[in-house]
């Protein structure tokens, strides 16, 4: 999507007046917040691949900022499907007093490179650099920046990247996870099946998933749904797990807000989500979870919104940690 398209999404934020500061508790009074204008820029990359990363920075509506948020977008076409929700949520966070950075990772959106040039490790490095940038920007504007929490906010595969990046960030972080998978393996399998679905029309689907996996294992790129998938990204996604990295203290990730959406009124966490949460809790990390009514906007045919998720997310990161 061109820069004009991204900023165009920014302009149609009719929900912000509705959700405003819904749920922000009296313990966090915000004095007459004024709408902020997002700032688009290119961040020179520190990664070996180099180039620039397109960023959109949302200044907080109040100073000092109540916290800092770095958004980690999902994988492939899910990124495009979720752009509107990411824009709405970023503006809502900024209105609630949080500084927000949206960054297009290597080969994605308006950043340098092609999707096929990306590696999982380079994506993690992009996120780490984004965190350093937003904290440095905050330090320029407030002496209290070090006291405010840093949040990594991921969606789907972005949750897996956020967990890996958290281990490399210079400070302790909190995680806001939207529809987090327990591992990347099913996400890769789902993506490979897009190729199988296309080949079904030509009668060539037999064994296609196994063939694609072998090509990736041999270090080759594969073309799926208009994306050139590199072996480095595929293997990184396939091996990613939503667990703390070995050797990283549990206190490095202080708190996790785990939010899922479902169109079912009686929806609850899946067994694998419950198990993953229990593993984090047993390691000493505070985890709170909610299942919220709303559509799977990252995969719907038409662009959709989940207003209840927007409000729940503002509430979640606005809560003070237990002392």
Mark where each language-model region is.
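Small-residue-biased low-complexity repeat regions
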Residues: 1-26
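Short, surface-exposed "cap/lid" segments of acyl-processing enzymes
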Residues: 60-104
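Catalytic nucleophile-loop/oxyanion-hole region of alpha/beta-hydrolase
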Residues: 108-141, 146
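Gly/Ala-rich beta-loop-alpha elbow adjacent to hydrolase catalytic centers
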Residues: 151-162, 179
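Active-site signature of alpha/beta-hydrolase-fold catalytic machinery across serine-
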Residues: 164-168
């Amino acid at each position: 999507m061109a820069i004009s398209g991204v900023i165009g999404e920014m302009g149609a934020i009719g929900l912000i007046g509705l959700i405003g500061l819904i749920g922000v508790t009296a313990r966090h009074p915000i004095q007459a917040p004024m709408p902020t204008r997002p700032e688009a820029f290119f961040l020179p990359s520190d990664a070996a691949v180099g180039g620039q990363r397109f960023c959109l920075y949302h200044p907080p509506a109040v100073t000092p900022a109540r916290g800092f948020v770095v958004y980690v977008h999902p994988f492939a076409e899910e990124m495009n499907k979720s752009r509107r929700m990411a824009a709405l949520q970023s503006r809502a966070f900024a209105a609630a007093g949080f500084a927000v950075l949206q960054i297009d990772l290597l080969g994605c959106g308006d950043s340098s490179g092609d999707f096929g040039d990306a590696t999982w490790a380079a994506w993690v490095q992009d996120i780490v650099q984004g965190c350093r940038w937003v904290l440095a920007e905050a330090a320029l504007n407030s002496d209290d920046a070090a006291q405010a929490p840093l949040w990594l906010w991921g969606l789907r595969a972005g949750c897996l990247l956020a967990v890996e990046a958290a281990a490399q960030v210079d400070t302790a972080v909190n995680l806001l996870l939207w529809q987090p998978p327990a591992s990347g393996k099913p996400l890769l399998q789902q993506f490979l099946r897009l190729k199988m679905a296309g080949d079904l029309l030509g009668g060539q689907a037999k064994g296609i998933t196994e063939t694609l996996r072998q090509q990736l294992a041999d270090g080759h790129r594969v073309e799926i749904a208009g994306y050139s998938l590199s072996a480095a990204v595929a293997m990184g996604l396939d091996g990613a797990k939503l667990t703390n990295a070995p050797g990283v203290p549990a206190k490095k990730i202080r708190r996790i807000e785990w939010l899922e959406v479902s169109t079912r009124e009686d929806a609850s966490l899946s067994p694998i989500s419950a198990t993953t949460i229990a593993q984090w809790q047993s390691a000493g990390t505070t985890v709170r979870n909610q299942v919220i009514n709303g559509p799977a906007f990252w995969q719907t045919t038409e662009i959709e919104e989940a207003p209840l998720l927007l409000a729940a997310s503002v509430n979640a990161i606005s809560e003070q940690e237990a002392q």
